[in-house]
Design a protein with these regions (language model features):
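Conserved MFS/SLC helix-loop-helix module at the cytosolic interface between two early adjacent transmembrane helices
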Residues: 46-85
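Helix-loop-helix hairpin linking two adjacent transmembrane segments in secondary transporters
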Residues: 125, 129-171, 175-178
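Cytoplasmic helix-loop-helix junction between adjacent transmembrane helices
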Residues: 90-127
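Helix-breaking motifs and short loop linkers at transmembrane-helix boundaries and internal kinks
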Residues: 27, 59, 80-86, 97, ...
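Extracellular/periplasmic helix-loop-helix junction of adjacent transmembrane segments
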Residues: 16-46
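Structural signature of the two symmetry-related core transmembrane helices
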Residues: 62-77, 284-302
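Extracytoplasmic gate region of multi-pass secondary transporters
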Residues: 15-16, 210-269, 325-328, 332, ...
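Central cavity-lining transmembrane alpha-helices of secondary-active solute carriers
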Residues: 38-53, 256-269
Length: 422
């Protein structure tokens, strides 16, 4: 799963570092290029929940293989873009494939990871993703003097097909069916797994899901997380180069600083969530990193907006991003805690709302630069989101499943059902 996270971020993060090169080739303004970023995030938001439900109904193994192959194809197709419109369309189709990656991951972890280790496992997963995102900027910066941006995309696209082959040969949807899993390991996986939950079918399922306060809070609190990540991989290189004059030789490393700093906090956020859960219960374990992480991020991003020294501005942005990412593993662990066998759909709903915030940020940033030449706008936008996220974390209750406990009868459009399977 860590290698999947790395492939995912490799393919999506590279476009930000290539941005100025692609802009020069197609003659695009900042506002126009914002729609390239927008198209990816829009598709990601549109297809995340449908893909999650598809995986819950058809099995994660096959769905995962198909979506990784899909986005790898469109990474290659992006390299063949011949004008602005083709670039926007191919990034949209690429985003449609990547949309299901993390909800599928949540479902895999709900089946394979013991309850007491969920936070740590999520932290390791996202640490790997951010390591890939950070290294991508450095690698692309190093390759651009020798290869065209198109050739680099072809290289990255081929990596996904290697992963699909390995995944399809190794993975099983049920750990009990895997020949390498022994009885002791299976008992550990199943030991603390919460009971399955009964749920209605069809529209009643969605109506019940969206009425849950926990789901609505998760949707709101994940917005700053996604908006921050996309700012780092899309606009940050331009900010550092245009606002503070960093040269291209140093740009890759400086632009990667927030993601490098986030590697440790991604892991630590998950680890400390598990430690606090074992000592004080799951409510304290999930809430604490979320509240502290966002509160610190709000302070650091405001300091970044006021910094005049280029190095200090970069450091404050890195601190804001890294403390923000303390919240990632607890958020995804909470999705599994309350979603159970529907964890893919719950995490998809949360992540989709995050993409909506990131979608809104793209034209806000792009056109504010074109019209006002003002880089403070994204920083204050993020600061407001961080405050909102911290407040939402204070009310999340990971002990309450989104559906009724197993065996409880639920009404589904005039009929009664206690089915658990979809």
């Amino acid at each position: 799963m860590v290698t999947l996270a790395m492939v995912t971020y490799l393919d999506r993060a590279c476009i930000g570092t290539m941005k100025t090169t692609i802009q020069a080739e197609f003659g695009l303004t900042e506002g126009e290029f914002s729609w390239v970023f927008f198209s990816f995030i829009l598709a990601y938001a549109m297809f995340e929940i449908p893909t999650a439900r598809w995986a819950e109904q058809r099995g994660t193994k096959n769905v995962f293989s198909r979506i990784v192959a899909w986005w790898s194809v469109f990474t290659l197709v992006t390299a063949a873009s011949w004008n602005y419109l083709s670039l926007v369309v191919t990034r949209f189709l690429f985003g449609a494939g990547e949309a299901g990656a993390f909800p599928c991951m949540a479902r895999v972890m709900s089946r394979w990871i013991p309850f007491k280790e969920r936070g740590t496992a999520k932290g390791i997963f996202f640490a790997g993703a951010y390591a890939s995102g950070a290294i991508t900027a450095v690698v692309v910066t190093a390759l651009l003097p020798f290869f065209s941006w198109r050739t680099i995309l072809v290289m990255f696209g081929l990596v996904g097909f290697v992963w699909v082959i390995a995944w399809h040969r190794w993975y099983r949807d049920d750990p009990a069916q895997h020949p390498a899993v022994n009885r002791a390991e299976l008992d550990e996986i199943l030991a603390d797994r919460p009971p399955e939950v009964a749920h209605p079918r069809g529209w009643a399922f969605w109506s019940n899901l969206l009425r849950q306060r926990n789901v609505r809070l998760l949707c709101l609190l994940y917005m700053p997380n996604c908006a921050t990540f996309y700012f780092c991989i899309t606009w940050l290189p331009s900010y550092l180069q245009n606002q503070h004059g960093f040269e291209k030789a140093a740009l890759g490393w400086i632009a990667s600083l927030p993601l490098f700093a986030s590697i440790g906090t991604q892991f630590f956020g998950g680890y400390i969530s598990d430690v606090l859960t074992r000592k004080f219960g799951v409510i304290v374990g999930r809430r604490t990193p979320g509240i502290i992480g966002y509160a610190c991020a709000a302070v650091f991003i405001v300091l970044a907006s006021t910094a005049r020294d280029p190095v200090m501005a970069a450091v404050f942005i890195a601190l804001a991003a890294s403390t923000c990412m303390l919240t990632t593993a607890p958020a995804w662990s909470t999705c599994v805690d309350i979603g159970r066998e529907n964890s893919g759909t719950v995490s998809a709903a949360m992540n989709t709302s995050g993409q909506i915030a990131a979608i809104a940020a793209q034209p806000i940033i792009g056109y504010s630069l074109d019209w006002f030449h003002d880089w403070n706008t994204p920083f204050w936008f993020l600061a407001g989101l961080f405050v909102m996220g911290a407040l939402c974390w204070a009310f999340v209750d990971p002990t309450k499943p989104v559906m009724a406990p197993a065996g409880k009868v639920v009404r589904t459009g005039g009929t009664m059902s206690s089915d658990v399977a979809l």
